[in-house]
From Swiss-Prot:
Family: Belongs to the glutamate--cysteine ligase type 2 family. YbdK subfamily.
Catalytic activity: L-cysteine + L-glutamate + ATP = gamma-L-glutamyl-L-cysteine + ADP + phosphate + H(+)
Pfam families in the record: GCS2
The protein's name: Putative glutamate--cysteine ligase 2
Cited NCBIfam families: gshA_cyan_rel, PRK13516.1
Any GO MF annotation of the entry: glutamate-cysteine ligase activity
Keyword Transferase (UniProt): no
Length: 371
């Protein structure tokens, strides 16, 4: 199968995808209601899209093509409200969070769609264990070579995105010690991790053809990379974030990525090399394990600093681009998180410490989702 043609798109436009938990309102465990939600929203008018995901206990919402923080907020609120209304009719709850705090993966039911059934057959129990919930952000790119340059430039900032969005400290009734335990589920897939270091689309097409010829992949969807090109959309897709507990946080993180993209592609501050990935896995682990308190190592200088410090330094550098894009309010929120060194994982742990009940913690997640 040939690689899709890269459709050039308007630079720095963006789209947001959020995978949402569907829970019952009795004990706030995951419940099978995605099909019923899809039925209820038929005929509703809203921006973007709502689609089923791999199990009946999750559903995905996505914006249209956004230009600004204000537009993203407006669309996310509108889609969220449609889903909440439908959920109320079914007496089920919706919430963010990268993992459900106490669900048992073996209870999950794969959604009845050909691709999801194929994934279940291919990956076995991993498909049900993949009931985790992420935020994906697409960034428009003017041409395919720029997309690859942006992909590898953006990889340096993966720890930022993980730490800011982290909202999955609990798995199957246990505090994992991680801020983002969700990504540990992604690691199990053979084509996860980072994209190969190629900087021209011709070289990428050659790589893709070789992979297809091995019989390992059929399309770009088979790659579970942290960032991957999406040629049919003319974007790169950043895929490492947990779903935040509110759409406001999701919009702020998306606009941080948008502003970074403008800085990286316009100013070209980085000289890219394969050596940029020497500390990639280490930095990624630190973000998952320790959140904003984690350490990140500069691959070129060896300098070590906390992820929070690196974010604050980055915000200073990209400030002119925030002004141009109208994303100052979003970046102010990002800066406040970095200064306080708190994220949604911190909030979840605080609630659990107070309530001593994961059921109550999930109930409060549902309330946060409505804010």
């Amino acid at each position: 199968m040939a690689l899709e043609t890269f459709v050039n798109s308007e630079p720095f436009t963006f789209g947001v995808e959020l995978e949402i938990q569907v829970v019952n309102t009795h004990n706030y465990d995951l419940t099978k209601a995605a099909s019923d939600l899809m039925r209820l929203i038929q005929g509703e008018t809203f921006p973007g899209n709502i689609t089923p995901e791999i199990t009946e206990s999750m559903i995905e919402l996505s914006t249209g093509i956004c230009h600004s923080h204000e537009q993203a907020l407006s669309e996310l609120h509108a889609i969220r409200d449609v889903l909440v209304k439908a959920a109320d009719q079914l007496n089920v709850g919706l919430c963010g969070g990268g993992t459900h705090a106490f669900q048992q993966w073996s209870d999950r039911q794969i959604y009845d769609a050909p691709r999801f059934q194929y994934i279940s057959e291919l990956y076995g129990y991993l498909a049900k264990q993949f009931t985790v919930f992420g935020q994906h952000v697409h960034i428009g790119c003017p041409d395919p070579d720029s997309a690859l340059f942006l992909l590898h430039s953006m990889s340096r900032f993966i720890p930022h995105f993980i730490a800011l969005s982290a909202s999955s400290p609990f798995v199957q009734n246990v505090d994992t010690g991680f801020h983002s335990a969700r990504l540990n589920s992604v690691f199990a897939f053979p084509l996860s991790g980072r994209a190969p270091f190629v900087l021209t689309w011709d070289s990428f097409e050659e790589y893709f053809t070789k992979m297809v010829n091995t019989g390992v992949v059929n399309s770009m969807k088979d790659f579970y990379w942290d960032i991957r090109p999406k040629p049919g959309y003319g974007t790169i897709e950043v895929r490492v974030m947990d779903t935040p507990l509110s759409v406001d946080r999701a919009a702020a993180i998306a606009c941080y990525i948008q502003t970074l993209a403008r800085y990286l592609l316009t100013d070209r501050p980085l000289k890219l090399s394969e050596d940029d990935y020497l500390v990639y896995t280490f930095n990624r682990f630190e973000a998952c394990r320790f959140g904003l308190e984690g350490t990140c190592v500069n691959p070129q200088t060896g300098e070590r600093r906390t992820i929070a410090e690196d974010i604050l330094d980055t915000l200073d550098r990209i400030a002119p681009h925030a002004a141009a894009l109208g994303s100052r309010a979003a970046l102010d929120e990002i800066g406040a998180l970095a200064k306080a060194r708190v994220n949604d994982a911190s909030w979840l742990r605080t609630v659990f410490k107070q309530e001593k009940s994961l059921n109550e913690t999930v109930r409060q997640q549902c309330l946060r989702w409505r804010e």
